């Protein structure tokens, strides 16, 4: 199956509506990622078909839970999920933060080539970031408690944290400090026969 067909069928299965131009931009991002990945090792996934499933569709699966408002992608890496969500939500502002200069250089190039005026790329650590966003999204890089400890300084009473995790998080939710409340949502990613969970946390 072509990359375009895999993407289109996946978008339909997720119940989303993305224009031909948006889908073209997403495939252009995959092309760019494949090209840069040969020299810079941005992702362990090498196969473009897998990139469509594990990067594009995996990121788009959270779109239904993404509210309006400025969004900070912490540890964006090669721009996942931030670039993908920014293509899907062109009217929404995204800040993509990562401490790896090699990866932020790639994301800046992707921003230019894809014409993503709604994206700002920041090279730095979340501990030094000071602007409180409406919501924070990330592919989980630590336990929920550890992530919250890092992000508490930029979370207001209304800020939501959306953590994309591979496995069930019920035990982690049960051990959250009292000032936090969380819900987990099981995600189905078309073409991926692996568990995916989105945890949404905010102040109680």
Curated annotation (Swiss-Prot):
NCBIfam families: rsmG_gidB
Biological role: Specifically methylates the N7 position of guanine in position 527 of 16S rRNA.
Protein name (Swiss-Prot/TrEMBL): Ribosomal RNA small subunit methyltransferase G
HAMAP family: 16SrRNA_methyltr_G
Family that this chain belongs to: Belongs to the methyltransferase superfamily. RNA methyltransferase RsmG family.
Any single GO CC term annotated in Swiss-Prot or TrEMBL for this entry: cytosol
Lineage: Bacteria, Pseudomonadati, Pseudomonadota, Gammaproteobacteria, Oceanospirillales
Catalytic function, reaction form: guanosine(527) in 16S rRNA + S-adenosyl-L-methionine = N(7)-methylguanosine(527) in 16S rRNA + S-adenosyl-L-homocysteine
Keywords: Cytoplasm, Methyltransferase, rRNA processing, S-adenosyl-L-methionine, Transferase
């Amino acid at each position: 199956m072509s990359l375009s067909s895999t993407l289109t069928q996946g978008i339909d299965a997720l119940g989303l509506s993305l224009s031909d131009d948006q889908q073209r931009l997403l495939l252009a991002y995959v092309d760019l990622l494949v090209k840069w990945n040969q020299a810079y090792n941005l992702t362990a996934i090498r196969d473009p078909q897998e990139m469509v499933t594990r990067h594009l569709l995996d990121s788009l699966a959270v779109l239904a839970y993404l509210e309006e408002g400025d969004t900070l992608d912490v540890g964006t890496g090669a721009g996942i999920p931030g670039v993908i969500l920014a293509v899907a939500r062109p009217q929404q502002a995204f800040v993509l933060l990562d401490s790896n200069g090699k990866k932020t250089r790639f994301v800046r190039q992707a921003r230019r080539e894809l014409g993503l005026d709604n994206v700002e790329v920041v090279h730095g650590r979340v501990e030094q970031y000071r602007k409180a966003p409406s919501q924070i999204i990330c592919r989980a890089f630590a336990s929920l408690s550890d992530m919250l400890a890092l992000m508490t300084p930029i979370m207001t009473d209304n800020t939501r944290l959306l953590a994309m995790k591979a496995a069930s998080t019920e035990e982690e939710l049960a051990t959250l400090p009292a000032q936090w409340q969380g819900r987990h949502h099981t995600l189905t990613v078309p073409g991926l026969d692996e568990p995916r969970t989105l945890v949404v946390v905010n102040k109680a």
